[in-house]
Amino acid sequence: MVSYASDVKKELTSLPVHPEHAKAELAAFLRMNGVLSLHDHQFSLDITTENPAIARRIFSLIKTAYGIEPLLIVSKKMKLKKNYQYLVRLQKQVHEILSDLEIFDSDNGLITGIPEKIMTSEQRAMSYLRGAFLAAGSVNNPETSRYHLEIYSLYENHNNDLLKLMNSFFYLNAKATKRRNGYIVYLKEAEKIGDFLHIVGAVNAMLAFEDLRIMRDMRNSVNRLVNCDTANLKKTANAAAKQVEDIQLIEKKVGLENLPEKLAILAHFRLTHPELSLKEVAAQVPDGPISKSGVNHRFQKIREMAQQLKEEN
């Protein structure tokens, strides 16, 4: 079964790759998922995924941004589900590209934060967030789970920079927390999750999210009303049962004919209509209609008389 998060990523990978934004999106992929290794006496940069659409996206980003076609290696995992694994391997201009994307500094040291040119450009920020979500993001199905979207980071300062991007440019009210093996930024508000999906370009997924959210909220509202009605019915039934019990006690001990006329009329009516609510009794009692508070006052008098009879025994 395809998950909602998979649908979101499928839509994002189908978006056109714009040359002016490709580097920002690629920078997120390489910074978050890239692995530098040595093959055949030369450095290579590998990105591994089980999603073929994401592999194609990375391939297109590298080709668009730098005019280089990386290797695309497909293998089959031998454990568990035996899924296919896709490896995108960059072997040319590795150091130059990592330096250009500000993942390496001038001494070839790793820069774990997000470059200033992305932190100060709204359009680049949108592209970077798209790449970050594709690389290490997830979102719950709004129909069946609590509202939650998150992006994982290995490094704390990268996580903090993601938080700044999401809040300073787009006012998403994102939060950050530490996980056992890293850090996450996350969204819990349904409206903000919808905004994020729109920002990164998943417009269809955003519309589907809003539809599912509205349906879920409507169901919750209906359930609350049903629960409220059920509680009110139960309360009405319990109150009526106690009133009938009091009236039957009075009838047995002294007879209803010895009650004041208004109380006797109400007592007889309640015995024949135990299912009616207080409001319905007030409207239908033979000497009425009277106010709901008036009916309640009469039942209170009956209650006091029944209580007195119990105490006498």
Swiss-Prot record:
Q: Which keywords does the record carry?
A: Cell cycle, Cell division, DNA-binding
The cross-references to InterPro entries, in alphabetical order and at most eight, read: Homing_endonucl, Sporu_reg_WhiA_N_dom, Sporulation_regulator_WhiA, Sporulation_regulator_WhiA_C, WhiA_LAGLIDADG_dom
GO MF terms here are: DNA binding
Q: A single GO BP annotation from the record?
A: regulation of sporulation
Which Pfam family, any one of them, does this sequence belong to?
A: LAGLIDADG_WhiA
- Which residue spans does the record list as DNA-binding? 277-311
> Which family is this protein grouped under?
Belongs to the WhiA family.
Biological role:
Involved in cell division and chromosome segregation.
This chain's protein is named Probable cell division protein WhiA
- Organism encoding this protein: Lactobacillus gasseri (strain ATCC 33323 / DSM 20243 / BCRC 14619 / CIP 102991 / JCM 1131 / KCTC 3163 / NCIMB 11718 / NCTC 13722 / AM63)
* Gene (name only): whiA
